[in-house]
Amino acid sequence: MSASKIAFLGPRGTFSHQAALLARPDSLLCSLPSFAAVLEALSSRQVDYAVLPIENSTNGAVIPAYDLLKGRDDIQAVGEVLVPAHHCIIGKSLENVQKILSHPQAFGQCSKWISANVPNAEFVSVSSTSQAAALASKDITGTIVAISSELCAVENQFNLLVKNIEDDSNNRTRFLLLRSGGFQDDLSPLKEKSLLQFYLSHPKKLSAVFEVFAAHKVVITNLVVRPSCKFPWTYIYFVECLGMEKHLIDRVGKYCDTFTFMGSYTNQISYF
């Protein structure tokens, strides 16, 4: 049997690369240029799995990832992976920095170091931290640096100037491990954490949904709200929760205009 394939946001050296290695160490790695390309490869079954960052412990929800998950019922969350997000500065010199390149999430996770050391530098957002490092490594003027991972610097032999510039030394990014195909209701019980996605046309319906959760002691661990783009001021809700049971799926769904059970997986976070 051939090895499974797992897609991640590349190039190699990104935190997504690290997540893929942790999630599926025996799978063949497939580096892709964007989150959209990662999900397209998964839904078209070019790969068997994908990792997608959804939350950082310092900077919160990864909004572009959630927006790509809106309305999808063709993929399933089957795991979560926590990746330590230790950031480094890559470049020629810190003496005359005019531009600092990175993924937008990294800027938010390293704001204290940036303010203290390169407060006047222009932020330039690129698709990944590894792409930022590759671009900065080509600069011959000494005016451009990048925020990236140490793995990226080591793998590509880039010049590493400063290590561990993240605001919080415990900074971590949480990834979902996804596989193709929607949720299949077999006889096995749900795992401890579940991901739900639902659309509500009126805010009063949210109270009804939460009443079901409360009555059955379902604990909400994460709630992300995004514009539905169907009608103004209506929303799609992404809910991660502990204690969801199969008999509650229909009970919650009856209050929702659309409802998708996006999978269940082992919880990797200690909340209590």
UniProtKB/Swiss-Prot annotation:
GO biological process: L-phenylalanine biosynthetic process
Name of one Pfam family that matches: PDT
Keywords for this protein: Amino-acid biosynthesis, Aromatic amino acid biosynthesis, Cytoplasm, Lyase, Nucleus, Phenylalanine biosynthesis
Cellular component annotations (GO), alphabetically ordered: cytoplasm; cytosol; nucleus
Gene3D superfamilies reported in the protein's UniProt record: 3.30.70.260, Periplasmic binding protein-like II
Its EC number(s): 4.2.1.51
Catalyzed reaction equations: prephenate + H(+) = 3-phenylpyruvate + CO2 + H2O
An example molecular function term from Gene Ontology annotations: prephenate dehydratase activity
Keyword flag Lyase: yes
Prephenate dehydratase domain residues: 5-180
Pathway(s) it belongs to: Amino-acid biosynthesis; L-phenylalanine biosynthesis; phenylpyruvate from prephenate: step 1/1
Subcellular location: Cytoplasm; Nucleus
UniProt domain ACT: residue ranges: 194-272
Top-rank taxon, per record: Eukaryota
PANTHER family, per database record: PREPHENATE DEHYDRATASE P PROTEIN (PTHR21022), PREPHENATE DEHYDRATASE-RELATED (PTHR21022:SF19)
Protein family (similarity comment): Belongs to the PHA2 family.
Function: Putative prephenate dehydratase required for the synthesis of L-phenylalanine.
Record-given protein name: Putative prephenate dehydratase
Organism the protein comes from: Schizosaccharomyces pombe (strain 972 / ATCC 24843) (Fission yeast)
